[in-house]
Amino acid sequence: GWYMGTEIGVRDFCDYQRYNILEEVGRRMGLETHKLSSLWKDQALVTINVAVTYSFQKNKVIITDHHSAAESFMKHLETEFPPARRLPADWDWLVPPMSGSLTPIFHQEMVNYILSPFFYYQPDPWMTHVWRNGEMCLKKQQISFKAVARAALFSSTLMSRVLANRVRCTVLYATETGKSQTLAQRLNSMLNCAFNSRLLCMEDYNFSDMEQESLLVVVMSTFGNGGSPGNGESFKKQLFSLQYLRNKSRYCVFGLGSRMYPQFCAFAHAVDAKLEELGAERVTPTGEGDELNGQEEAFSAWALTALKDAYKEFKIQGQLSLQLPGAERFCEAWDPLRHRVAVESCPQDRITALSAIHSKAVLPMKLKSKHNLQSPQSSRSTILVELERERSPEVMDFAPGDHVGVFPGNLPQLVAGILKFLPQTPPTNQCLRLGYRSDTFRVMRKTGRLLDASQHSLCLRHSPTSWTLP
């Protein structure tokens, strides 16, 4: 019922069609929301449900958890019904929306059937009521099948004319797990708003259509040792056996893979190189999505860039602002109606802010020394960097071969020298936070990205990671 914790904590708060706060909670908890294998969804979900149960109990409102409800139902089955007699039960409705096989009801076999006579959901009374006054009753308008057929034909004719004037586009995908297909379907829906786009699997693609393509978009994963998925083998053989293209079409490629393997996105780069060799024109640089590091975010950013480049290439203007879910965070243009900067009430120091942004432990260090281990005559460069750790309660845990990420900072003297040339500079100890308004929720949401410490830190302390100061 309504007062079972999971109905509120899972369904109401975490369903995509409802409040959908799961990712926001995960970011505030400092979880790696860009990597599904970190199981951040499960951790955030449990935390939300614990908070819901605690808030009800704190205010002395009765609520039950899903484990207690499941055990209570199993006890009800044992005591009320003998073994030879069973009543209908709907497994989908009775099993809680979290914990799965940890609840005993998950393993209970059920049969869902209807015993007659049976009262279904009550129909609308005004549809079945017998009106005493005939003028008040609802009169159904009779529409002939011929009229419906004419309307459908007219609509399809108009749509065909609109699509005929659009640029043809084909979205191809090759996948083993279905991830590439999901992303390709999402991209195809966006392209259909401005192009005459179609979605095909590589094995279903008629390769003779390659000469007539205006825009070819390829979304694929890499399988095995840099090879193609099973449904992309035929396309790969035909493409790499091709010598030239008479029609120099445009194309763009997005590859999916995992950096755990040495041949990361090798198939995508091979297809990109072959199309370029055949003379096709690349619309946007090849994108890469790492399964272990923000694959969805990488695809969203690449898709927006590809759409903008395609619009510019084919001179398409006046189109709607198309975005993927959550892609408003990748928008480069400042929109006062969508973005705002607010003063952070609880300022964070620079190390804490960087740790929260990247969901990793960041330790303050100073550069002690650096030496080039190669000889001056060598064309190679191997630099030994020694870092001196500052005082910090954090324990440094590492293993040989680990990679190191560095967030360099500028000298305070350089920062102060540049700040004096900027008009109306805010206090150097002021923290700002960027907020954006989502298309799904018409409210300002925090990005989780603290504009660390003012103009002093934001513009000058962190700027070397993005560009070079004069």
UniProtKB/Swiss-Prot annotation:
Entries under Pfam families matching the protein: FAD_binding_1, Flavodoxin_1, NO_synthase
GO molecular function: calmodulin binding; FMN binding; metal ion binding; nitric-oxide synthase activity
Flavoprotein listed as a keyword: yes
Positions contributing to FAD binding: 403
Catalysis performed (reactions): 2 L-arginine + 3 NADPH + 4 O2 + H(+) = 2 L-citrulline + 2 nitric oxide + 3 NADP(+) + 4 H2O
Region annotated Calmodulin-binding, chain positions: 145-165
Entry's family note: Belongs to the NOS family.
Subunit-structure text: Homodimer.
Name assigned to this protein: Nitric oxide synthase, inducible
